[in-house]
C-alpha cells in the first residue's frame, strides 16, 4: 500500500530563508525539506511522507491575499497530495492568517483535507475556526515539540477518513459547530449530574457551549470635520527616541501617552518604533508612515479638521493579549472623553497588531467616539469587530511607500487620511471597509 502524500505549507522563517527582512518573499517550492518539514515527515514515516514544502513570506501573503493563495494552491496541487499540513503558526498573526487561509482554500477549492495549528489568540484562529481544523498550540515556537506531534497525529486521522471527535478529545480549537453524538446515559441523567457538580462548586463542562458575540455600535458620524478634535492612537509602537516608557517589542504590558504639541513632522531624530513584529527600518526612517502627524497638522492649518489632539497613545500590538488591548483602551478612552476628542484615527501594522488595534477600536467606540481603523490586513479588523476600516499600504509602512519621493509619499499619505476622514463623516450601520482610491 502506497504511503499517504503530505504537503507542508510554512512561512519564510521556518523555511530558513530569513526573518522580517525576507517577509516579502513570493511563494516558492523548497528544493529540499526544511528542518520543520523533515521533523513532520519523521513523525509520520510509518504511514506517510512529506512530498513537498511550499513557502511564502508572511508580509507578501498579507498584502497579496488572493494572488498568493492562488499561486500556493497551484504549487500544492502539483504534488497531488492526500492531505496538507500548514504551520504551526503559534501566535504569529500574519503566519496564522496565511496558514488558515491556505487550509480553508485547500479544502474548498482542491477538495483535499487539511489541518493547521496555532495559539488560540492568533487572529487566524478567530477568523477560520468555523471553516478549518486548527490544532491548539502554545504561543511560541518553544511549543513546537508538542504542537507538531499533535498536528501529525490529527493529520493522519483526517487523511485516513477516520471519525473526528470533539475539540477537547482531539485537541483542535472549538469550531462552534454542533453535531449529534451518542452517550451511554440519557440527557436527563447527564443534566442532573451537571447540576450537582455546579451546586457543589465543582468543575463541569456544558454540552452546549454558547458562542460569544462582541459587537459595538458604530459611533455617530462627524457632522462638521472643520470643528472636530481628532486624536491619534496606534498599535504600531511609535515612541519618542529611546522608548522612554520601555514598551515591550512584543506582548506589551503597557502603553505610552506622548505630547506632539508644536510638532509638525515625526523625524528620525526624535521618533522611532518599539514594534518587534515587522522590519522597523521604514518606521524608524519616518514615523509618519505609521501615524500621519505631518498630514493631520497640514489639515489642521488648512481648516480641514478643527484640531489635532496634543497627545497620541501608542503600544506595540504584536502578540499583545486581547485583554491587555481592551484594558489599555478602557484607561485612555476616559482621557479622550475628558479632553473633548470628537474622533480617533487608529493605525496598525502586522497581524496580531491589527487584532490589538481593532480591540482598542471597539473599546474606544463604546464611549460613543467614532473611530476609523487604518490597517493592511483588513480581514482581521473585520473579524475582531471594527466598524469603519480603511485599507493601508503595507504592514511595515501602513501610511507610506518608501519607493516614492518624499513629496509623492506625503501626497499618498494625505489620500489615505482623506479616506479616513471620509469614513468618520459617513454614517454606518454595519462594519464597512471603505474602498481605497490610492
UniProtKB/Swiss-Prot annotation:
The keyword Oxidoreductase applies. It comes from the Bacteria. It catalyses: acetyl phosphate + [thioredoxin]-disulfide + NH4(+) + H2O = [thioredoxin]-dithiol + glycine + phosphate + H(+). It is an enzyme of class 1 (oxidoreductase). Keywords: Oxidoreductase, Selenocysteine. One of its GO terms (cellular component) is glycine reductase complex. The active site is at residue 350. Its EC number is 1.21.4.2. Pfam families: GRDB. GO terms for molecular function: glycine reductase activity. Belongs to the GrdB/GrdF/GrdH family. NCBIfam families: gly_red_sel_B, various_sel_PB. In the first step of glycine reductase, the substrate is bound to component PB via a Schiff base intermediate. Then the PB-activated substrate is nucleophilically attacked by the selenol anion of component PA to transform it to a carboxymethylated selenoether and the respective amine. By action of component PC, acetyl phosphate is formed, leaving component PA in its oxidized state. Finally component PA becomes reduced by the thioredoxin system to start a new catalytic cycle of reductive deamination. Heterohexamer of two alpha, two beta and two gamma subunits. Component of the glycine reductase complex, together with components A and C. PB is substrate specific. This is Glycine reductase complex component B subunit gamma. It comes from Peptoclostridium acidaminophilum (Eubacterium acidaminophilum). The gene is grdB.
